[in-house]
Regions:
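Canonical Rossmann dinucleotide-binding motif of NAD(H)/NADP(H)-dependent dehydrogenases/reductases
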Residues: 2-34
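Short, small/polar-rich loop/turn modules that mediate ligand/substrate recognition or access, typified
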Residues: 175, 180, 235-237
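Alpha-helical segment proximal to the catalytic Tyr-Lys
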Residues: 128, 172-176
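Catalytic Tyr-X3-Lys loop
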Residues: 84, 101-120, 135, 139, ...
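Active-site helix of classical SDR
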Residues: 123, 159, 167
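Residue(s) in the substrate-gating loop at a strand-loop-helix junction
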Residues: 143
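Substrate-binding pocket helix/loop in short-chain dehydrogenase/reductase
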Residues: 96-100, 104-109, 194, 201, ...
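Short C-terminal tail/terminal secondary-structure segment
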Residues: 97, 148, 225, 236-249
Length: 249
């Protein structure tokens, strides 16, 4: 299946984890991939690994929270061809396991700047390149924390709730444009970072999930691929659940 033949996809935070899994899935189905990551060396390594498999991939270094860098990145990518898919997977956890009264304002603002402002800027400049073509797919990676809130993670929860708000607003604003914007709100996904956690910590997280397991990278990549495909033509402004039944709304 080559659903994305002759399409260019930009994946932020695409050097590792969820972002890379989505990048690889889209590449497998014919997309030319741009890995956009703050760490240029890591983004190039990810692009190289895709090229090694015979896929079309390039890399670019940019901080999603810096408007000048985001604009420059999209300007460069646009010169290479029309960009019809953008997935924003860049983000940080921020203060974790800390009561709100002990959270430093600078840490709160940094988390929101990367997760929330970054999502806004990526959506803004993705729209600028997609609207003239009257077609595009934007996907923002949110979190179950944005729907339910996680104790001890006020900055992350607030920033991801904001991402869901962006999707709702922008989806309605551009509903007739041919450009859709949606989000995925995952619970715990089995990434290399999660694999390194203590078993009891993983059990604590999976106990909240009715399926009693972590999500798999290929599962979120498969869902993401459908959301950014032409098949998903009547969905916009929506946040898709990826929580094994934890959130059913």
């Amino acid at each position: 299946m080559n659903r994305f033949e002759n399409q260019t996809a930009v994946i932020t935070g695409g050097a590792t984890g969820i972002g890379f899994a989505i990048a690889e899935k889209l590449a497998e189905e014919g997309a030319k991939i741009w890995i956009l990551d703050r760490d240029k060396a890591s983004s190039e390594m990810a692009a190289q690994s895709l090229r090694y498999k015979g896929y079309k991939a390039d890399s670019i270094g940019a901080d999603v929270s810096d408007e000048t860098e985001v604009k420059a990145a999209f300007d460069k990518i646009s010169k290479d061809g029309d960009c019809s898919i953008v997935v924003n997977s860049a983000g940080i956890v921020g203060p974790n396991g800390i009561n709100t009264t002990e959270v430093d304002l600078a840490d709160f603002e940094k988390t929101c700047r990367i997760n929330l402002t970054g999502s806004f800027l990526i959506a803004k400049y993705a729209l600028k390149v997609m609207l003239p073509n009257k077609y595009g797919r934007i996907l923002l990676i949110a979190s179950i924390a944005g729907k339910e809130g996680n104790a001890g993670m006020v900055a992350y929860s607030a920033s991801k709730a904001g991402v869901i708000g962006i999707v709702k607003s922008v989806g309605k604003e551009y509903a007739e444009s041919g450009v859709t914007i949606n989000a995925v709100a995952p619970a715990t996904i089995m990434t290399s970072m999660v694999e390194k956690m203590e078993p009891q910590q993983i059990k604590y997280m999976t106990d909240k999930i009715p399926m009693k397991r972590c999500g798999k990278l290929e599962e979120i990549a498969n869902l993401a691929a459908w959301i950014v495909s032409k098949e998903a033509s009547f969905n916009t402004g929506f946040t898709f659940d990826m929580t094994g039944g934890r959130a059913v709304y």
